[in-house]
Amino acid sequence: MLGAVGPGALWGFEREIMNLVPMVVEQTSRGERAYDIYSRLLKERIIFITGTVEDNMASLIVAQLVFLEAENPEKDISLYINSPGGVVTAGLSIYDTMQYIKPKVSTLCLGQAASMGALLLAGGEPGMRYALPNSRIMVHQPSGGFRGQATDIEIHAREILEIKRRLNEIYVKHTGKSLEEIESSMERDNFMVAEKAKDFGIVDKVIDKRGGEQI
């Protein structure tokens, strides 16, 4: 949660971080060209999901996915995830785009993939979902709060239960587990080491060295 940090402070912090992003200089036939490191990696079809999943970040991820599809619809895309989760609807916009576009999307967890981060990790192409050995994965049911009239509270309660049902169905689809197993596993915060996430069906392989995998 962001707590009492206002959007102005957050964007100021992000600007400071961007000032620290390394630049990569390449020689081309037209001379030198400088890229920030993330733009250079985007040329290699690598996208990073880092930090809280929210609308601004999700729109950038979706735009990158669609751009890479337009550039080459037959070439795989790699999604590197280090996220504590965030807003469900923002995460689902990324997930739906991953399923919608033509390129296969491989996923790799480095650091952590919690909440919506875990769902995006699980939503990668079957056989192409990876985790580094010391990464942590956490799944749970959605949470939220609402204040208002009793009828409005009831409406929002039905909505969060519908979201819970939809998320559970997504996990059933990508893990191969039954709905009952998923519901039981999501009842409380469920932390997993990489190997346990593999057994659960969120990832296909735990890797500690780069091999023949396209990631």
Swiss-Prot record:
It is found in: Cytoplasm. Keywords: Cytoplasm, Hydrolase, Protease, Serine protease. GO terms for cellular component: cytoplasm; endopeptidase Clp complex. Its EC number is 3.4.21.92. It comes from the Bacteria. The active site is at residues 115, 140. InterPro entries: ClpP, ClpP/crotonase-like_dom_sf, ClpP/TepA, ClpP_His_AS, ClpP_Ser_AS. One of its GO terms (molecular function) is serine-type endopeptidase activity. One of its GO terms (biological process) is protein quality control for misfolded or incompletely synthesized proteins. SUPFAM superfamilies: ClpP/crotonase. Pfam families: CLP_protease. It is an enzyme of class 3 (hydrolase). Fourteen ClpP subunits assemble into 2 heptameric rings which stack back to back to give a disk-like structure with a central cavity, resembling the structure of eukaryotic proteasomes. HAMAP family: ClpP. Belongs to the peptidase S14 family. Cleaves peptides in various proteins in a process that requires ATP hydrolysis. Has a chymotrypsin-like activity. Plays a major role in the degradation of misfolded proteins. PANTHER family: ATP-DEPENDENT CLP PROTEASE PROTEOLYTIC SUBUNIT. This is ATP-dependent Clp protease proteolytic subunit.
